């Protein structure tokens, strides 16, 4: 049946088919190319395609062909004798193929990359005697987005409002935006067509309830895209406008007539900054001993006790707020407790105990020494004691002595007799 079909085919077609069939026993050739190539919108991109011939294999390449899936005809052809032919000569170019050279490199360069260029392309080598070999390459068209982040200045509203805005403009595919914040809140993200066809602009808002504690704090917008080596981080410092928050410091509840000048300070937080400070009392203007100096109030020494409530009123562009503080100036500091302090008494007691202990030890050693000396003297001079006893009483008395003492004195006694 195969011979019947072959007989029915035209001779020229049979010749072409024979050229495309590899002879038995020949080594296989390989077309090498990446499965996907990225390119940026408006730039040029190269679709690499190479013919790998094994060992000593003899291969003759007669033609290189590029085509796109879904389209009829070829977009670029390079013939071994006729040279290149392009469907769009100003946008296409063979990178290495030249007349008179071995056609092993079919890489194709595309200029002015457009969104519609994205697709699947086929690189084809027509060889002899191995036949045709091809490979498919996916061209991915990217657009690198431009990213910005800005603060949304707000006032105290009591309800959630956008406080920061992050925009990724003209990305293909759309960028992915996330937020990082320790202040709470939630994102609101939307997409819209970009300025260039096929691109997308992503806008993300960070929403929370504004407060004075949020003012000056920061949130971070994180933008991720295929064209970035790493995510882009954009930090936004928040701005919340609010009227002054006021307090008075400097009074320690321990002021007396004898002390030096004292100072009260009006502490105010606001955005925008305070524009004025006004000091007064609940009774009206300041007394003579109080002198206002901007955010400070100087209290001069007084000669009589006072009990006054001072008021500090602070204003800014959004309004005014005030704080009150009652100050008492007393006759004098509390008197020190009579007598010695407990610490001094404790040290004195410890000193006395140590002294008595040392005296006791000294007396003990002194008496012990005297006892030893008395016994020694008594043993050496018994006659003196006897003489003293006879002189005092008018008669002679003999005292007992130890054998050792008697024996030591015998020679002397005998000699005397």
Swiss-Prot record:
Keywords, alphabetical: Cell adhesion, Cell membrane, Disulfide bond, Glycoprotein, Host-virus interaction, Immunoglobulin domain, Membrane, Phosphoprotein, Receptor, Repeat, Secreted, Signal, Transmembrane, Transmembrane helix
> What about PTM?
Phosphorylated by Src kinases on tyrosine residues in the ITIM motif upon ligation. Interaction with TIGIT is required for Phosphorylation.
Q: Know the name of this protein?
A: Poliovirus receptor homolog
UniProt entry tagged with the keyword DNA damage: no
Question: InterPro entries in the record, alphabetically?
Answer: CD80_C2-set, Ig-like_dom, Ig-like_dom_sf, Ig-like_fold, Ig_sub, Ig_V-set, Nectin/PVR
Q: Which gene encodes it?
A: PVR
Q: Which residues lie on this side of the membrane: Cytoplasmic?
A: 368-417
Annotated domain remarks:
Contains 1 copy of a cytoplasmic motif that is referred to as the immunoreceptor tyrosine-based inhibitor motif (ITIM). The phosphorylated ITIM motif can bind the SH2 domain of several SH2-containing phosphatases.
Using the chain's own numbering, where are the disulfide bonds? 49-123, 166-221, 266-312
Q: Where are the transmembrane segments?
A: 344-367
Task: Summarize subunit and interaction data from the UniProt record for this chain.
Answer: Can form trans-heterodimers with NECTIN3. The extracellular domain interacts with VTN, CD226 and CD96. The cytoplasmic domain interacts with DYNLT1. Binds with high affinity to TIGIT.
- Topological domain (Extracellular) residues are 21-343
Name the protein family: Belongs to the nectin family.
GO molecular-function annotation terms? cell adhesion molecule binding
- One GO biological process from the UniProt record? positive regulation of T cell receptor signaling pathway
């Amino acid at each position: 049946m195969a011979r019947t079909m072959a007989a029915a085919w035209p001779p020229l077609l049979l010749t072409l088919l024979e050229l495309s069939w590899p002879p038995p026993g020949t080594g296989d050739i390989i077309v090498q190319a990446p499965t996907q190539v990225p390119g940026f919108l408006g730039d040029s991109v190269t679709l690499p395609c190479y013919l790998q011939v094994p060992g000593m294999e003899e291969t003759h390449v007669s033609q290189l062909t590029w085509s796109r899936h879904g389209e009829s005809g070829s977009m670029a052809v390079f013939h071994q004798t006729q040279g290149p032919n392009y469907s769009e000569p100003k946008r296409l170019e063979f990178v290495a193929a030249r007349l008179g050279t071995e056609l092993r490199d079919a890489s194709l360069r595309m200029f002015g990359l457009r969104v519609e260029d994205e697709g699947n392309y086929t690189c084809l080598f027509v060889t002899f005697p191995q036949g045709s070999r091809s490979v498919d390459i996916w061209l991915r068209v990217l657009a690198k987005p431009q990213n910005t982040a800005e603060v949304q200045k707000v006032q105290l509203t009591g309800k959630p409002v956008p406080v920061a805005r992050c925009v990724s403009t003209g990305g293909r595919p759309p960028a992915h935006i996330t937020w990082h914040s320790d202040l709470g809140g939630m994102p609101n993200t939307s997409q819209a067509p970009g300025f260039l066809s096929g691109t997308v602009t992503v806008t993300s808002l960070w929403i929370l309830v504004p407060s004075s504690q949020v003012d000056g704090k920061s949130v971070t917008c994180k933008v991720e895209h295929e064209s970035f080596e790493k995510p882009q981080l954009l930090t936004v410092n928040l701005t919340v406008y609010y009227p002054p928050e006021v307090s008075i410091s400097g009074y320690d509840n321990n002021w007396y007539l004898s002390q030096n000048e004292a100072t009260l300070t009006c502490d105010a937080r606001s955005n925008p900054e305070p524009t004025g400070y006004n000091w007064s009392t609940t009774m009206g203007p300041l007394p003579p001993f109080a002198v206002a100096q901007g955010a400070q109030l100087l209290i001069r020494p007084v000669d009589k006790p006072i009990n006054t409530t001072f008021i500090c009123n602070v204003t800014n562009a959004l309004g005014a707020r005030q704080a009150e503080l009652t100050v008492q100036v007393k006759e004098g500091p509390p008197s020190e407790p009579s007598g010695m302090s407990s610490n001094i008494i404790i040290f004195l007691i410890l000193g006395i105990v140590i002294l008595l202990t040392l005296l006791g030890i000294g007396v003990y050693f002194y008496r012990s020494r005297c006892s030893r000396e008395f016994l020694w003297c008594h043993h050496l001079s018994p006659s003196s004691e006897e003489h003293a006893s006879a002189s005092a009483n008018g008669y002679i008395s003999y005292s007992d002595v130890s054998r050792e003492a008697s024996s030591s004195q015998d020679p002397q006694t005998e000699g005397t007799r």
